[in-house]
Amino acid sequence: MFPQKITLWLYPLGLFANLFFGTAFCVQWFLIKKRGCSFVPKIFWHLSCSGAVLMICHGFIQSQYPIALLHSFNLIIYFRNLNIASSTPLPISKIVSLLVVSATAITLSFAIGTQYLPHMTWMASPNILHLNLPEANFLWQLIGCIGLTIFSLRFFIQWFYLEYKNQSSLPTPFWKASLVGGSICLIYFLRTGDIVNVLCYGCGLFPSLANLRIASREAIQKPFSCSCFISAGEHSGDTLGGNLLKEIHAKYPDIHCFGVGGPQMRAQNFCTLFSMEKFQISGFWEVLLALPKLWYRRRILYKTILKRNPQAVICIDFPDFHFLLIKKLRSLGYKGKIVHYVCPSIWAWRPSRKTTLEKYLDLLLLILPFEQKLFKDSPLRTVYIGHPLSETIKLFCPKQNWKERLHLPTDKPFVAAFPGSRHSDILRNLTIQVQAFQASDFASTHHLLVSSANPAYDHLILEILQQNRCLHSNIVPSQFRYELMRECDCALAKCGTIVLETALNLTPTIVTCQLRPLDTFLAKYIFNIILPAYSLPNIILGRTIFPEFIGGKKDFRYEDVAAALNILKTSQAQEKQKNACKDVYQAINESASTIKECLPFIFEASY
């Protein structure tokens, strides 16, 4: 429109316009800090109107049609925010008419100007620093238009809230559009060398980020809902979660519980966001491959928690995943109580996790007696509740005629096998358990009954039994595992919670855990996990009551397991293990609180 010298001389007009916008946002920011909540004063709209008028002029002077057009729209929306609070607000139809007239006037002005004025174009790229930049092609101009459109769209979002929600405010979608549009505009103006707009849009990102952070914190400060998030990622955690839900529903029937759980938790009217089975991964390589899915599920979980704002978050075992979730919740301002049920194995490896527990948790529930000493001088509130399995097994009433119901042979006694619940566990552990049974003295006198924790893997169990020609064998569903433990002469069990269950059922047991070569290497040489014992009964008593065979293929052979199994052929050896199992039960229940006694601290504000 103007000769180049005049255009360059008037170029700072855009800077003055943005000073008005910057001042408006500074005033709004100051009042937010002062009042402690989102607020948009009238002066914000007055300053914005002044800035918009200058930016429309700037758009004409610099031959930038999108800037002139979009700021003319914004000017009308600023006016509407002032007008709607007046005694004579205009009808919305007149505001729409003003937008149409404005768009028509700006477009016709540029159409005539580009036709008859030699210095005028639709979208110029001022380069007042005379940088050696090539002309922006159509693609870059399209990117610039998209950025400016998104950036200006924020006030149409604000207008929607104004008209239909009767809120003269700057909602969260406004700031999101500001952030996205402003970022695209910044990239475009960096490309074109437009230094004023680089400064303006670059600085303009800070109010967007700051207000989005405030909006996030305000969402957390809303009243807690009458709900509780509970997460269990493993079968043992599902058992603990099922017992916990029984106690919660009995004492606080109005509390809605949701989260991640398995069949036992779902049986307690538990609303699952993800089933526990989606988190069942073991071994370094499997975890590595599953990281994207785990990361996605973690994101869904923390967003849901922040949206629902439950009174408490209770994470059961599964520490590596749960620690990431807990840290994210605290970083985003979650103020509810966070409880971790089951202490991570800090006594075995990574003792630094104790600091993480103390920093993020309100309560840690301990289930093993020796863990109390670890937190003797800790500021973290801990409660030793004993292992819930001891009470479950104490109250357990065996099902009558369970063998007949499952059509199991009754002509011989039997040995039980508990290979684990995951596909990889069954593949490695059941193979060596079956081979050990076949090589032992029990093979000629006993049946082998294999406990199946997951019916989906029954076909795998059958394949392994057939491959090893174990003819005298059957599969027993996991719901009959306690009957199986109590009536078998002895058991082969994969290292884990199941070993504690066999101990509490007074079942003579041999512990096996065959690892992948990579897992063996990591455990021995990277994480330095070298302990005198690995199964819970042995750790609790501080002595070996169950023989352990843990490691890679080179660490032990099935013949070694068979030799240990043969020792249990005698009644004296079986009685010795059973007496030691009674000591385990006594150690677990000594000076233990109950989960019921912990619930008031979690759900009642007075605690």
UniProtKB/Swiss-Prot annotation:
GO terms for biological process: lipid A biosynthetic process. Residues 1-224 are annotated as: Unknown. Keywords: Glycosyltransferase, Lipid A biosynthesis, Lipid biosynthesis, Lipid metabolism, Transferase. It catalyses: a lipid X + a UDP-2-N,3-O-bis[(3R)-3-hydroxyacyl]-alpha-D-glucosamine = a lipid A disaccharide + UDP + H(+). Pfam families: LAB_N, LpxB. Pathway: Bacterial outer membrane biogenesis; LPS lipid A biosynthesis. The keyword Transferase applies. This is Lipid-A-disaccharide synthase. Residues 225-607 are annotated as: Lipid-A-disaccharide synthase. Its EC number is 2.4.1.182. In the C-terminal section; belongs to the LpxB family. Coiled coil: none annotated. It comes from Chlamydia muridarum (strain MoPn / Nigg). Gene3D superfamilies: Glycogen Phosphorylase B (3.40.50.2000). HAMAP family: LpxB. GO terms for cellular component: membrane. Condensation of UDP-2,3-diacylglucosamine and 2,3-diacylglucosamine-1-phosphate to form lipid A disaccharide, a precursor of lipid A, a phosphorylated glycolipid that anchors the lipopolysaccharide to the outer membrane of the cell. GO terms for molecular function: lipid-A-disaccharide synthase activity; phospholipid binding. It is an enzyme of class 2 (transferase).
